[in-house]
Structures are given as C-alpha cells and as structure tokens.
Amino acid sequence: TRRDWGHSKDYVKGIWMILQYKKPEDFVLSTGKNYSIEDFIKKVFKILDLNWKNFVTTNNKNFLRPSEVRSLQGDSSKARKLLNWKPEYDLDALCNDMLLNDLKLYGMTLEQAKKIAKKLSKK
C-alpha cells in the first residue's frame, strides 16, 4: 500500500493560499510522491536506531482492508502553478516531527526513547 504522505504545515499553508486566491477554485494539495507504509516505518525506526523488522510484520493479509486502495498519489500541479504552492517538508521531516510530537505527549525526549528502544531490541 502506497500513500502520498504530506505534512500538515504544508497543507495549512496551502489552504490559506487557496483562501487568498482571487476567485473560488478547486485545488488539490499533495506532495505528488507516494511511499509505502514500509518506507514510513523504516524512517521512524531509523530515527530510534531500531531494526524495524524486529517489531513489525509485513505482508500479512490479516492486516489488509478488504477493499484497500493500493496506491494514492495526488496531482497538485494546479496549486503549484496558480498559487505558487509547493510542499516544503519531505517524508523525513514528517516522520521526525510526528515522532517528536508523540514523544512530547508522553513527556519524553528522543534520547530517552532511544534508551527504551535499545532495551526493547535486546529482548
């Protein structure tokens, strides 16, 4: 399964730009790139210095939705052309920001999470 993962900061900026446009129009905001969920997981686990294969099962049909869309990728060419909008955050930045935000919710730093992750990987 592949998705067009984008950062909320890019989308909020794009929405603001759409609202400033001279007339009502339909726009698609997307990165125009799609990545597998495995790509996403690898990046997050890399930040934590973990081997994702020790924690994640892939290709198990029990975890697939019956009507799963295999690939979703947006075409933001209209927004890029008329609004001069483009995403500023790549998948690495998205993964990093999401992880750091979740850690903050738990009152943890990245270094604390890495220590816990290291202990878990030894089990």
For every predicted segment, state its role.
Residues 1-123:
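C-terminal substrate-binding subdomain of Rossmann-fold SDR/epimerase-dehydratase oxidoreductases
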